[in-house]
């Protein structure tokens, strides 16, 4: 008689224990789900940030690649110009007197010895002149600037863009000299024509 009662009493405690562990497990699962959801949200934000940085890096890579390609083209162009000018100097040099030949050779050797500080100074002067011309074109009031200080309205210039600007300025100067020489040649031809008349 006692055996069935003890078995019945033991079975009556099982649903309460089972109910308690199920509720506790659900709470733990809910907490873990919320934690995982917060981690997922944080990782998603970080992934979006990395994707944005990746696209920005790709944009910078394309920009630097184009700049590098342009500098490479400009370097080959300047090397070809130097080679042609050296050829012209070599052709003209024998027609000079011995004294003038030595002077010209010395001047050519001195011209080849360009130091980095001299190059930086030349680039800085060219950029300042270019920026002043831009300010004058915009009709902005000009105030004297300390050495090395750039106008606030103009973006900061990096070394690569500085070289590109310098090369662009050099090409403009070269073109203006060619135009001037061509104009002088036209005036000489007109003078010769008037003299022949």
Swiss-Prot record:
Annotated segments matching region Disordered: 170-197
Region (CCN domain): 166-197
GO cellular component: nucleoplasm; nucleus
PTM characteristics: Ubiquitinated by XIAP/BIRC4.
InterPro entries (UniProt xref): Groucho/TLE_N, Groucho_enhance
Expressed in which tissues: Ubiquitously expressed in developing embryos by midgestation, a wide expression is conserved in adult. In mouse, abundantly expressed in muscle, heart and brain.
Keywords noted in UniProt: Nucleus, Phosphoprotein, Repressor, Transcription, Transcription regulation, Ubl conjugation, Wnt signaling pathway
Keyword Repressor: yes
Matching Pfam families: TLE_N (PF03920)
Known function: Transcriptional corepressor. Acts as a dominant repressor towards other family members. Inhibits NF-kappa-B-regulated gene expression. May be required for the initiation and maintenance of the differentiated state. Essential for the transcriptional repressor activity of SIX3 during retina and lens development.
The record's note on its domains: Lacks the C-terminal WD repeats.
Name of the protein in question: TLE family member 5
Annotated organism of origin: Mus musculus (Mouse)
Source species taxonomy: Eukaryota, Metazoa, Chordata, Craniata, Vertebrata
């Amino acid at each position: 008689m006692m055996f069935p009662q003890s078995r019945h009493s033991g079975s009556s405690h099982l649903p309460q224990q089972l109910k308690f562990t199920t509720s506790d497990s659900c709470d733990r699962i809910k907490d873990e789900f919320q934690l995982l959801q917060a981690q997922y949200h944080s990782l998603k934000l970080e992934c979006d940030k990395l994707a944005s940085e990746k696209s920005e890096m790709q944009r910078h890579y394309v920009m630097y690649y184009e700049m590098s390609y342009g500098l490479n083209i400009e370097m080959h162009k300047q090397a070809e110009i130097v080679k042609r000018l050296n050829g012209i100097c070599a052709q003209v040099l024998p027609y000079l007197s011995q004294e003038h030949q030595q002077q010209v050779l010395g001047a050519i050797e001195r011209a080849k010895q360009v130091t980095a500080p001299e190059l930086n100074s030349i680039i800085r002067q060219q950029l300042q002149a270019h920026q002043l011309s831009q300010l004058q074109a915009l009709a902005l009031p000009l105030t004297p600037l300390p050495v090395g200080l750039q106008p606030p309205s103009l973006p900061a210039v990096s070394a690569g863009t500085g070289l590109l600007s310098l090369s662009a300025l050099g090409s403009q100067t070269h073109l203006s000299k060619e135009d001037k020489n061509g104009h002088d040649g036209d005036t000489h031809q007109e003078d010769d024509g008037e003299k022949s008349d």
